[in-house]
Amino acid sequence: MVAPGFLANPEVRRWLKGVEPAWTMLEFNSLNALRQEPSGSNKAIRLEPDLADGEISGSAVTENALILLRRAAETGGLKLTATGNLSRAVVEEMCGVIKAPGYNKAELLRVQKVINEPDVLPLHFVRILAQAAKLVRTHRAKLIPTPLGRRLLAAEQHEPLQALLFHVAFWRMNLAYFDGYRFLAPK
């Protein structure tokens, strides 16, 4: 599923470091099916809705979504700024409890005096994802759990959370928002 000679190009071979990507072996229809949203008719990707807690705990995003949901439920809502981000006090508190492999809070504090939510990408991503998944919503300058979020917090309802978050992240959100580049429309 690549242009003839593409993989023979020395620049491409150097960039790939000798690895031939699996997608190059796909036919056009197979590649297209993988790019489409999972559904009853498109079974190229199947999202497992009944994972065990041990399997869920392996996902930092799912664990952090549960932490965010619990904090919002336990505190009567998480305080938001006028722009809709979590307040600095909430960000400081959440930085101590979220799981963020490879994220170095000390390094961030070294270059910034104050930390806003967008500065902590693992937290910012999870908050936006939880809102896009309709697990939380804003109400009177607070982030509160929705009925769906409260149901998922019930001990026996964690199973579908990872599938829901994966589905929303890859088929409902614009992940380009997180790349740091503003979209420039042609003039």
Report each predicted region and the residues it spans.
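Accessory beta->alpha helical hairpin/"wing" motif in late/C-terminal subdomains of nucleic-acid enzymes
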Residues: 124-126, 133, 137-184
